[in-house]
């Protein structure tokens, strides 16, 4: 046969070569190809010895995907051996240039086609490349007007990318198909003209720019269309002008009467003569008896070559056959007969076509088990996406947060339909833990995260034009965080959780839901599509249709398999199609995303393969499960024929229809067909399928489908009854999907695969799941590599455990275990998480990890520096630090500073080898001194623990890398175990296993983009070296140098930051001085100095080794980590204490730093003290060794950077200790203590201010050297995950470091938290926890779980510090015109005259005269004596320029016994005179009727617990309205009823001091207070309002509450309860509905019943009372001072108090500035938030802030900067609430006008804008600076913008001197100077003016800079401003 074809080609060549000038192709062209999916399938999975059909027409073209099928080279070689010269390759424009233009090519596609072309060239086949066959890019840019230009751009791209491999180019292979693809409004002729122009441009570009490549260009034409094309000049270019040869698509019917010469006659009309190539040859009806291939070809040649038309070659596919008997043998040949290729015989052969399912099943049916289960060691294609998934209702929780509406799954949970009556209300709490979830993803190294959007979180009712802002914000934060972590978001629009509101309308059985879904999707595309590029419309719609509406097992629980199930699917498909088309039309052009659908399917194997009916049932099963949705979308727009036929048959067999399958209209079919950019596939398990045993007419999924489902008992079982482990099923399913649906045109995204474990199983060691993932993922790899299936992703289910529908929380799918019993819902990685990470890192299954290239020096390390040889001083020059900082006020010291660190700041965490590694004797490691010590009984370790296992980091490397990535750290500081590398301590015993561990750790860090910082020695000396004397043996210096040299040589190519010793100060003292650490040498006077001497020399030796041998090639830095506590002098003004503090610094930090960073020698302070004390001890020489001059020179400058470990501070004073016995500690001659006000920790008190001072001291002492804080952290004894104290520690300490950097110019380069995780903390064992991650030491796997501090630290890293949040930025502006400015007081607190003029006793009179009730036994008998000082008070008010004055009336001064039996006219007259004086001063009165001071006579009959008081209060109010109402237009009934009820009758802190009925009395009192208010309001409203025209309301008080942990839903709920119990207790009945809020009613009722009561302790209002109470307000009076951090606290049920009912405990943030009151922290942000809460909760009522202020304690504090800060900040937040949030705020009142009697604290807490000098009998009111500041705000009505120039309101009038007795001039500390108050006042004015000028200048400069560049970089180190933080 080969001889036959050789003769034929020889003859053909003689025809073709006559006159040929195509020298490069002088041989006859015989062309095969292109590749099709069917061809690849037949070659790969031969069935018997059958030959493959190579006709290309009608086949699905192969879309290039990597890797190329492995058998292609053999196939190509076989073609070349069969005389084939060329092979057709069809490029995909849409694949190469998805956007249509060359600006963003698909690199993977380019590489793939190049590999294909190179494979052809390697087989000596010439590629014949077609630029476009079908499928234009999906881009709006492909408009008619620019099509030709875009095609030319594409052609240019192809010529450039592939031209070196291609000699023959064809622009179009099917003009008709291309015409149909162009925009339809154009006529066919104009579209053909467009194609002609596109071809012409491509032709010209090739010959102008790429002619040197020597190729030819043409276009494929239908032979019958030649004449038509030649007639039109506009298209003739296609046939003769713009082609190098004519390429024809030729069909020939052998039986046709028309001869070839007639058919090709038009070829002769083309001038000049062109060469002809038959690109496609189709033979029809050519029986073998008629013609041989040779005769047929000769007749073609004769017809074409007539009149010198030259034939170049033919398409020989018609004559080509290949056979393949096994995968290893492919044979292609040209047949000598046409019989094999005749249509007639082909039709006969295929009379019973084999279905896709049957073909796929037959591919694998006879596969031996060993071959089936063989593990493939290979990698996935480049660009393959790895990820994990979740669903909204599975993990989010927050079911009612942010206005979210309920979904069908919420309803399902509330009906207690899930196992264990579980609900998804909290689930995994991802709504609040999105940042933690993204951290988990980083830990996994996930590249894509598939999550779903909760429809009802966006649109609570399913519809509407107003989406929930909170819901949108949640997804924005999640998406932005994913992208910031380089994780691709894949957003699912619908994951089974239909809004319940839509379900109430019929759900997916109501056609209108389609419109609602499209609207919802359209919003999501608009809101998130600029960042989300992968969209899933529906996730597993089969599950919802089958289980939600078929079996009823899922929400919404409808059981109607015959009708509802099919209705739902029908509407889902229509919703999907419309959504896809909406995206395609409206969003794709701009967003360039992809929209698909995720379908789930099991694989189906016939139960009895020998039974055809089982085979048919298996295929039917797939069509019912997968084809139900896939066939309409990916095939023809309609349901599978098999499915339709089966349902029809079943309905015909039954007396009534069993199922109703809706029909699509033709329009709907067109809409559905092709409506997906990818097919997402979920797969979990496989089934054995048989034909249903009998035809049942009872509708069910199986009976309708006619099949029965089974499993093989041999298949491993999981905890889920429906999932068996059948890995090979996924490969078969992927092959089926590829051939049946995607056909190489649409990529497959594997979007769901996983298995659960049960609650009773090992929740962390999920070995079965590890095997599951390993095997299933490997089968996916086989599908890609061996079956050429185009799979683009693997997405595991699930990221973490969640709510699993009917199974509740019993089925755990998570790679991360979630502890649902903990309120914080902590996540802990399972073994399967580490497996998946390993696969991701290797991109598959490699036996060895890929060697990573060396990373760039990402840490931006400083260059080598040299120390200065400055002489020492005693005390050192660093004493300026104490001078600068020690006299700061607490407010100045602790005020929080906002800013960021340098851009290359190195954020990291630390650990050390012995503390975490474990494996103490594994793999040849030698023992260390700590191994020996901990194994010795009585060693002093607290819990008798050892580091034998510790965190097991030696065996848990994957776990450590996981948490490091999750933290987002840039660097990891760890130490090497000397005895793990050199077991005996010397280089004669190198342990390769230990070296390998550190290599893997370092490589893993670098692969995770984490910079390694390596410590050579962290206290764990090899025991073998200790046995020869340890560091007291001089040879240790050489041995340490040898060890370091080996480390530099082995790891230095990747490690660029080395630390020789960690904390040598502590090591030398604890190990050789106190003897508490090994080697336990107790020699306090001598050994520490000797050891330190050796360590310093050892360090210097190693430094020089690195400097001389490695620095030039490795380019790293080297130093040592020194430790120090800040020393604060007890009396900063006492020189001896300052010297003692400096001495402590020199004896600890300077001991090592001074020789290394300064002079090469010890500090003079040390030499002096130790030398003198040695002499006094009668020693011949100093106990402190000395260095030779040579050693000093060698030591000096042996560190490139300064590494500092610091944890705490000490207060130091001079002390003269005993001389003997000698001791390093006594040599320092000082005493240490800690301030008891500093927060406690497990080891030392926290004193964050010391951080800034210590950094400044280093700068002053050692110069501007780069500093790295290599350890800082806090130990806690409580192992809980909610380590809020650790957050406070880091927050305050790092803020002080930030101040040092930004304000003081300290050259700070990095910060490392101690520690990454809990570990062995030396003598404390495992009792103290320093870790950001909790380690469970009781669990053999030592799982690591993130604490909330880990999330906080990640946030710091993300923000690179503590930038000022945009919402906290100061705003300029003015309040609305008419805004009320006021100040307030209360009668009892200021009036005095407690028994004057007939005043009756009040409860506070009684209370203050009772011992132990008031601080300092203060009484208010005189107070401020305002009863006698009306004029002084009015002057004070005028100082403030206020428009209003809020004061209260003393009930017992008007009605001495509380009743109207007697009205005290003298008392009433006081208020008349006061009001008249106010009005005369143009100040309007705001009168509070009741401010805590109940007449004692009423208290004697029960007070507010007696319901008669309601009437008494109404009568009292009536007197006030009658007598004062003509002058008072602003009334407040009650002030802070919460305080009256809670503190007066609950805690007993306030009068009347009742505390023994805390669970009932406060509620009774509150009940009566509300009714009394309502009665007073109605009285005024009904009787007086018309004539007096005033307003009346109540003043409510409330703190704002923030959740302690904002990521914990329990804490969020607790914060809400806190506010509802405080502010809502009284506001809700009055401002909302006349009744208590539901939170209170529910809480109190449930706790009352739990305590055994029959009813709630909270009284109930009758319906008439509710109506009377509701709406009894004209405004919302509001008092606010501070904010708390709230968290859930479960009190015992027997405890009946308001606090217990509330179920909340509260703390405060340590960084919040304090005040004179323990309960009041300055939190201005909370003011704005609670004003917004009032707006939202009570429909934006008019609000008057009736109290707001801050206290101090101590002296007069005239220059009260603290109060100015408070007022400025709080009032500015109020301005934001008005301007930005549209809160209806009408007025602001500062508390208080003047210092007064502050209830149970007496006169200790001072809130006044005026100082009242109680030591002066005249009680003068002296204005503080805050009074003047407040007056300026009042006059300016806010904060005028300085950028607009000086405002007239800032021009202050002359001060009015108040009437007062002479006061002595007091001294004021101002900016470190002692000034008189007058001078300080003048200085403050000057400073204030300068500040205003500075602010104006700064504003102008900021505007100019912002205008010039929006992207201005942060200040460099040289640009930092040393301004104060205040």
UniProtKB/Swiss-Prot annotation:
Subcellular location: Apical cell membrane
Main location group: membrane
Region of interest: Glycosyl hydrolase-1 1: 44-286
Region (Glycosyl hydrolase-1 2): 360-853
Phosphoprotein recorded as keyword: no
InterPro entries: Glyco_hydro_1, Glyco_hydro_1_AS, Glyco_hydro_1_N_CS, Glycoside_hydrolase_SF
Active-site residues (renumbered): 1063 (proton donor), 1271 (nucleophile), 1536 (proton donor), 1747 (nucleophile)
Molecular function terms, GO-annotated: beta-glucosidase activity; cellobiose glucosidase activity; galactosylceramidase activity; glucosylceramidase activity; lactase activity; phlorizin hydrolase activity; protein homodimerization activity
Glycosylation sites: 49, 321, 510, 821, 887, 932, 944, 987, 1033, 1172, 1506, 1654, 1670, 1759, 1813
Membrane topology, Cytoplasmic segments: 1902-1926
Keyword Transmembrane on entry: yes
Protein family per UniProt: Belongs to the glycosyl hydrolase 1 family.
General function of this protein: Broad specificity glycosidase of the intestinal brush border membrane that hydrolyzes lactose, the main sugar in mammalian milk, to produce D-glucose and D-galactose. The mature protein is composed of two domains that catalyze the hydrolysis of beta-glucopyranosides and beta-galactopyranosides, with a preference for hydrophilic aglycones (in lactose and cellobiose) for one domain and hydrophobic aglycones (in phlorizin and glycosylceramides) for the other.
Name this polypeptide is given: Lactase/phlorizin hydrolase
Provenance organism: Oryctolagus cuniculus
Lineage: Eukaryota, Metazoa, Chordata, Craniata, Vertebrata
């Amino acid at each position: 046969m080969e001889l036959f074809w050789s003769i034929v080609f020889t003859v053909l060549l003689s025809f073709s070569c006559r006159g040929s000038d195509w020298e490069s192709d002088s041989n006859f062209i015989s062309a095969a190809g292109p590749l099709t999916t069917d061809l690849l399938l037949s070659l790969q999975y031969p069935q018997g010895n059958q030959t493959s059909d190579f006709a290309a027409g009608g086949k699905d073209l192969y879309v290039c995907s990597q890797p190329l099928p492995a058998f292609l080279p053999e196939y190509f070689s076989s073609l070349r051996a069969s005389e084939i010269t060329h092979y057709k390759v069809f490029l995909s424009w849409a694949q190469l240039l998805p956007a249509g233009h060359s600006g963003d090519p698909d690199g993977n596609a380019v590489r793939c086609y190049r590999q294909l072309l190179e494979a052809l060239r390697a087989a000596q086949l010439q590629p014949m490349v077609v630029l476009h066959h079908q499928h234009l890019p999906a881009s709006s840019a492909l408009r008619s007007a620019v099509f030709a230009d875009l095609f030319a751009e594409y052609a240019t791209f192809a010529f450039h990318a592939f031209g070196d491999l291609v000699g023959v180019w064809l622009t179009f292979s099917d003009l008709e198909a291309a015409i149909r693809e162009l925009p339809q409004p154009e006529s066919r002729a104009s579209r053909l003209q467009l194609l002609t122009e596109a071809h012409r441009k491509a032709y010209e570009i090739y010959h102008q720019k790429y002619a040197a490549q020597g190729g030819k260009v043409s276009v494929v034409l239908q032979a019958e269309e030649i004449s038509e094309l030649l007639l039109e000049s506009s298209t003739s270019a296609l046939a003769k002008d713009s082609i190098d040869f004519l390429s024809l698509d030729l069909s020939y019917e052998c039986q046709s009467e028309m001869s070839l010469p007639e058919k090709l006659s038009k070829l002769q009309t083309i001038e000049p003569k062109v060469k002809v190539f038959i690109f496609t040859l189709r033979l029809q009806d050519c029986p073998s008896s008629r013609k041989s291939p040779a005769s047929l070809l000769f007749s073609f040649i004769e017809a074409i070559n007539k009149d010198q038309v030259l034939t170049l070659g033919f398409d020989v596919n018609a004559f080509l056959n290949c056979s393949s008997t096994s995968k290893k043998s492919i044979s292609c040949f040209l047949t000598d007969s046409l019989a094999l290729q005749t249509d007639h015989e082909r039709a006969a052969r295929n009379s019973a076509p084999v279905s896709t399912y049957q073909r796929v099943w037959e591919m694998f049916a006879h596969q031996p088990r060993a071959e089936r289960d063989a593990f493939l060691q290979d990698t996935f294609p480049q660009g393959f996406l790895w990820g994990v998934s979740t669903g909204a209702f599975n993990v989010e929780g927050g079911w009612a947060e942010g206005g979210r509406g309920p979904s069908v799954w919420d309803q399902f949970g509330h009906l207690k339909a899930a196992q264990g009556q579980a609900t998804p209300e909290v689930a995994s709490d991802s709504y609040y833990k999105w940042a933690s979830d993204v951290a988990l993803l980083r830990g996994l190294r996930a590249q894509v995260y598939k999550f779903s959007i909760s429809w009802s979180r966006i649109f609570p009712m399913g519809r509407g034009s107003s989406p929930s802002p909170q819901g949108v914000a949640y997804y924005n934060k999640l998406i932005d965080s994913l992208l910031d972590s380089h994780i691709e978001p894949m957003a699912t629009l619908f994951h089974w959780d239909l809004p319940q509101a839509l379900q109430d309308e019929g759900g997916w059985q109501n056609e209108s839901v389609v419109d609602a879904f499209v609207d919802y999707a359209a919003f999501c595309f608009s809101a998130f599509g600029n960042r989300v590029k992968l969209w899933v419309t529906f996730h597993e719609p089969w599950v919802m249709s089958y289980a939600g509406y078929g079996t009823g097992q899922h929400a919404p629980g409808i059981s109607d398999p015959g009708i509802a199930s099919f209705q739902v699917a029908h509407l889902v498909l229509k919703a999907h199609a419309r959504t896809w088309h909406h995206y395609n039309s409206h969003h794709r052009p701009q967003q360039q995303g992809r929209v698909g659908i995720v379908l789930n399917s099991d694989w189906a194997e016939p139960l009895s393969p020998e039974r055809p009916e089982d085979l048919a049932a298996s295929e039917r099963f797939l069509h019912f499960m997968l084809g139900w949705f896939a066939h309409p979308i990916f095939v023809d727009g309609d349901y599978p024929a098999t499915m339709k036929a089966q349902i029809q048959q079943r309905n015909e067999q039954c007396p009534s229809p069993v199922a109703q399958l809706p029909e699509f209209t033709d329009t709907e079919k067109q809409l559905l067909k092709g409506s997906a950019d990818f097919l997402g596939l979920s797969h979990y398990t496989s089934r054995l399928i048989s034909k249903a045993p009998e035809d049942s007419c009872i509708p069910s999924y199986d009976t309708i489908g006619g099949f029965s489902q089974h499993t093989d008992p041999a298949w491993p079982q999981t905890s889920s009854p429906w999932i068996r482990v059948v890995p090979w099923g996924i490969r078969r399913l992927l092959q089926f999907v590829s051939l049946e649906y995607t056909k190489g045109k649409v990529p497959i995204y594997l979007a769901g695969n996983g298995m659960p474990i049960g609650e009773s199983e090992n929740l962390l060691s999920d070995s079965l799941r590890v095997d599951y993932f390993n095997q299933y993922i490997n089968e996916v790899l086989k599908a890609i590599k061996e079956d050429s299936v185009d799979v683009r992703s693997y997405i595991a289910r699930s990221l973490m455990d969640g709510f699993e529908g009917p199974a509740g929380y019993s089925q755990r799918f998570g790679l991360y275990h979630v502890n649902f019993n903990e309120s914080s819902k902590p996540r802990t990685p399972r073994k399967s998480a580490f497996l998946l990470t390993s696969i991701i890192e290797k991109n598959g299954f490699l036996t060895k990890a890929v060697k990573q290239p060396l990373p760039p020096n990402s840490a931006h390390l400083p260059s080598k520096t040299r120390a200065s040889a400055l002489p020492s001083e005693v005390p050192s020059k660093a004493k300026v630090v104490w001078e600068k900082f020690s006299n700061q006020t607490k407010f100045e010291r602790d005020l929080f500073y906002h800013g960021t660190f340098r851009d290359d700041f190195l954020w990291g965490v630390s650990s050390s080898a012995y503390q975490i590694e474990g494996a103490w004797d594994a793999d040849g490691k030698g023992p260390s001194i700590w191994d020996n010590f901990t194994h010795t009984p009585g060693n002093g370790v607290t819990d008798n623990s050892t580091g034998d296992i510790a965190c097991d980091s030696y065996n848990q490397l994957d776990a450590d890398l996981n948490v490091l990535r999750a933290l987002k750290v840039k660097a990891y500081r760890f130490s090497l175990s000397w005895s793990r590398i050199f077991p005996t301590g010397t280089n004669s015993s190198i342990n390769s296993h230990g070296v390998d561990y550190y290599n893997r750790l370092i490589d893993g860090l670098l692969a995770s983009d984490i910079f390694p910082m390596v410590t050579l020695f962290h206290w764990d000396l090899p025991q073998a070296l200790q046995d020869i004397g340890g560091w007291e043996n001089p040879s240790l210096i050489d041995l340490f140098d040898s060890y370091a040299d080996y480390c530099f040589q082995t790891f230095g190519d990747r490690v660029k930051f080395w630390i020789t010793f960690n904390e040598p100060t502590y090591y030398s003292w604890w190990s050789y001085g106190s003897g508490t650490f090994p080697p336990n040498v107790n020699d306090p006077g001598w050994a520490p100095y000797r050891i330190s001497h050796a360590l310093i020399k050892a360090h210097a030796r190693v430094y020089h080794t690195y400097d001389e041998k490695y620095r030039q090639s490795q380019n790293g830095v080297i130093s040592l980590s020194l430790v120090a506590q800040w020393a604060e002098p007890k009396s900063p003004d006492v020189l001896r204490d300052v010297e003692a503090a400096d001495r402590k610094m020199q004896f600890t930090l300077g001991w090592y730093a001074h020789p290394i960073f300064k002079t090469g020698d010890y500090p003079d302070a040390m030499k002096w003290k130790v030398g003198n004390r040695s002499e006094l001890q009668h020693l011949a020489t100093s106990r402190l060794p000395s260095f030779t001059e040579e050693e000093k020179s060698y030591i000096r400058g042996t560190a490139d950077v300064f590494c500092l470990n610091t944890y705490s501070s000490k207060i130091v004073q001079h002390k003269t200790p005993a001389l003997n016995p000698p001791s390093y500690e006594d040599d320092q001659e000082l005493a240490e203590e800690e301030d008891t006000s500093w927060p406690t920790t497990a080891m030392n008190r926290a004193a964050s201010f010391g951080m800034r001072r210590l950094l400044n001291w280093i700068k002053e002492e050692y110069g501007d050297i780069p500093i790295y804080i290599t350890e800082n952290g806090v130990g806690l004894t409580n192992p809980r995950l909610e380590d809020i104290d650790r957050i406070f520690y880091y927050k305050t300490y790092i803020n002080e470091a930030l101040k040092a950097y930004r304000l003081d110019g300290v050259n700070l380069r990095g910060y490392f938290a101690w520690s990454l995780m809990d570990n062995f903390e030396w003598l404390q064992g495992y009792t103290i926890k320093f870790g950001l991650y909790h380690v469970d030491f009781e669990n053999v796997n030592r799982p690591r779980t993130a604490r909330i501090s880990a999330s906080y630290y990640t946030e710091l890293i993300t923000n690179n510090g503590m930038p000022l949040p945009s919402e906290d930025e100061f705003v300029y502006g003015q309040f609305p015109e008419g805004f009320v400015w006021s100040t307030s007081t209360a009668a009892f607190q200021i009036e005095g005259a407690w028994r004057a003029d007939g005043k009756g006793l009040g409860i506070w009179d009684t209370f203050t005269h009772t011992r132990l009730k008031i601080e300092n036994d203060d009484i208010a008998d005189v107070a401020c004596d305002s009863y006698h000082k009306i004029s002084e008070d009015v002057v004070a008010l005028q100082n403030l320029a206020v428009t209003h004055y809020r004061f209260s009336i003393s009930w017992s001064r008007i009605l001495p016994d509380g009743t109207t039996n007697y009205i005290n006219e003298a008392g009433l007259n006081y208020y008349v005179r006061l009001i008249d004086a106010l009005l005369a001063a143009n100040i309007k009165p705001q009168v509070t009727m009741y401010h805590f001071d109940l007449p004692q006579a009423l208290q004697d009959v029960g007070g507010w617990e007696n319901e008669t008081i309601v009437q008494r209060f109404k009568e009292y109010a009536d007197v006030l309205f009658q007598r004062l109402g003509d002058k008072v237009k602003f009334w407040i009934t009650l002030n802070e009823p919460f305080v009256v009820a809670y503190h007066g009758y609950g805690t007993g802190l306030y009068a009347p001091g009742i505390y023994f009925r805390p669970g009932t009395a406060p509620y009774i009192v509150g009940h009566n207070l509300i009714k009394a208010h309502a009665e007073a309001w109605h009285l005024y409203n009904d009787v007086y309002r018309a004539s007096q025209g005033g307003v009346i309301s109540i003043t409510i008080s409330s703190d704002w509450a923030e959740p302690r942990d904002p990521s914990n839903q329990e804490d969020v709920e607790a914060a809400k309860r806190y506010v509802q119990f405080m502010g809502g207790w009284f506001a809700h009945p009055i401002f909302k509905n006349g009744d208590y809020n539901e939170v209170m009613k529910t809480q109190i009722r449930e706790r009352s019943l739990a305590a055994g009561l029959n009813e709630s302790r909270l009284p109930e209002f009758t319906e008439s009372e509710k109506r009377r109470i509701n709406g009894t307000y004209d405004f919302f009076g509001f008092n606010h001072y501070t904010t708390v951090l709230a968290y859930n606290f479960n009190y015992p049920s027997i405890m009946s108090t308001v606090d217990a009912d509330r179920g909340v405990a509260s703390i405060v943030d340590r960084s919040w500035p304090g005040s004179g009151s323990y309960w009041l922290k300055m939190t201005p942000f909370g003011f704005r938030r609670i004003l917004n809460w009032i707006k939202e909760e009570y429909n934006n009522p008019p609000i008057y802030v009736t109290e707001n202020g801050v206290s101090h304690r101590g002296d007069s504090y005239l220059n009260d900067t603290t109060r100015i800060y408070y007022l400025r900040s709080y009032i500015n937040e109020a301005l934001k609430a008005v301007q930005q949030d549209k809160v209806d705020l009408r007025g602001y009142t500062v508390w208080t006008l003047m210092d007064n009697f502050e209830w149970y604290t007496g006169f200790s807490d001072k809130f006044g804008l005026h100082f009242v000098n109680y030591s002066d009998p005249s009680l003068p009111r002296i204005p503080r600076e805050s009074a003047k500041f407040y007056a300026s705000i009042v006059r300016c009505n806010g904060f005028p913008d300085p950028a607009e120039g000086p405002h007239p309101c800032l021009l202050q009038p002359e001060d009015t001197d108040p009437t007062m007795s002479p006061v002595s001039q007091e001294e004021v500390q101002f900016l470190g100077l002692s000034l008189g108050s007058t001078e300080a006042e003048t200085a403050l004015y000057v400073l204030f003016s300068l500040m205003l000028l500075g602010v104006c200048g700064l504003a102008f400069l900021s505007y100019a800079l912002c205008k010039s560049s929006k992207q201005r970089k942060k200040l460099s180190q040289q640009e930092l401003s040393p301004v104060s933080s205040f």
